[in-house]
Swiss-Prot record:
Catalytic activity from the UniProt record: a quinone + NADH + 5 H(+)(in) = a quinol + NAD(+) + 4 H(+)(out)
Organism annotation: Shigella dysenteriae serotype 1 (strain Sd197)
One of the record's GO cellular component terms: plasma membrane
Keyword Membrane: yes
GO BP field: aerobic respiration
Classification of source organism: Bacteria, Pseudomonadati, Pseudomonadota, Gammaproteobacteria, Enterobacterales
GO molecular function, one term: 4 iron, 4 sulfur cluster binding
Record-linked HAMAP family: NDH1_NuoI
Cofactor(s) of this protein: [4Fe-4S] cluster
Enzyme Commission number(s) of this protein: 7.1.1.-
Entry note: cofactor: Binds 2 [4Fe-4S] clusters per subunit.
Residues involved in [4Fe-4S] cluster 2 binding: C70, C99, C102, C105
Protein name: NADH-quinone oxidoreductase subunit I
């Protein structure tokens, strides 16, 4: 072993001890989770929920756009119709063990029924418990869009009533009368 190799080896040892000394007294990055809250960015995408419109009815019209937009195919639903002609899902199922929380289902939803919340505590012991049904996903409130009601905004006719005759619905605008 030459003197040069000996000095290089000694230098690396001193540098390693110096680095350990610097990091030994630095602030720790590990946070104790339950005691210290976790910082979530404003646009954090967590658990998926189904919201209700201001009247208290579920917003989902079972259009199946969320299931088509999902890249992993974790959403499944079946459409049914009420007596007054409104569509709603007979069942709505999300498999959270497959979900990648990309938010494409929220973007595809025309009624803002699907929304991603900042809830991230979804650990389960059995994989079957990560399959959420409609009853598990429905929340009691309107979510991020409190005043939005799809049937009022879309102008869809309900059986037995023309457009504009439903409850709390404005009359449709005659576009031809607005022309110069």
């Amino acid at each position: 072993m030459t003197l040069k190799e000996l000095l290089v080896g000694f230098g690396t040892q001193v540098r390693s001890i110096w680095m350990i000394g610097l990091h030994a007294f630095a602030k720790r990055e590990t946070r104790m989770y339950p005691e210290e809250p976790v910082y979530l960015p404003p646009r954090y995408r967590g658990r998926i929920v189904l919201t209700r419109d201001p009247d208290g009815e579920e917003r989902c019209v079972a259009c199946n756009l969320c299931a088509v937009a999902c890249p992993v195919g974790c959403i499944s639903l079946q459409k049914t119709e009420t007596k007054d002609g409104r569509w709603y899902p007979e069942f709505f199922r999300i498999n959270f063990s497959r979900c990648i929380f990309c938010g494409l289902c929220e973007e595809a939803c025309p009624t803002t029924a699907i929304q991603l919340t900042p809830d991230f505590e979804m650990g389960e012991y059995k994989r079957q418990d990560l399959v959420y049904e409609k009853e598990d996903l429905l929340i009691s409130g309107p979510g991020k869009y409190p005043e939005y009601n799809f049937y009022r905004m879309a102008g869809m006719a309900i059986d037995g009533k023309d457009k504009g005759e439903a409850e709390n619905e404005a009359k449709p605008i005659d576009v031809k009368s607005l022309l110069p």
